[in-house]
């Protein structure tokens, strides 16, 4: 089993955890339908950038 040589510092622990926080979802308004959707995702009606994809 691998064993560390020395205890990681508080700084290294913090740097490792820096990406663990939850981020707020960015919503965008579709230009064509006016519907709100998650950025870079299709709308609930199946449109992406004004084109029907589903």
From Swiss-Prot:
GO biological process: translation
GO terms assigned for molecular function: structural constituent of ribosome
Region called Disordered, residue ranges: 1-24
Biased amino acid composition, Basic residues: 7-16
This protein's GO CC annotations: large ribosomal subunit
Keyword terms: Ribonucleoprotein, Ribosomal protein
Keyword Ribonucleoprotein applies: yes
SUPFAM superfamilies with a match to the protein in the record: Zn-binding ribosomal proteins
InterPro entries in alphabetical order: Ribosomal_bL32, Ribosomal_bL32_bact, Ribosomal_zn-bd
Family (UniProt): Belongs to the bacterial ribosomal protein bL32 family.
Alphabetized HAMAP family for the sequence: Ribosomal_bL32
Stated name of the protein: Large ribosomal subunit protein bL32
Species this chain originates from: Buchnera aphidicola subsp. Schizaphis graminum (strain Sg)
Lineage per the UniProt record: Bacteria, Pseudomonadati, Pseudomonadota, Gammaproteobacteria, Enterobacterales
């Amino acid at each position: 089993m691998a064993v560390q040589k020395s205890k990681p510092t508080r700084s290294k622990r913090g740097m490792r955890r820096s990406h663990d926080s939850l981020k707020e979802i960015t919503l965008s308004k579709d230009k064509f339908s006016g519907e709100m959707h998650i950025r870079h995702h299709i709308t609930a009606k199946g449109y992406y950038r004004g084109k029907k994809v589903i």
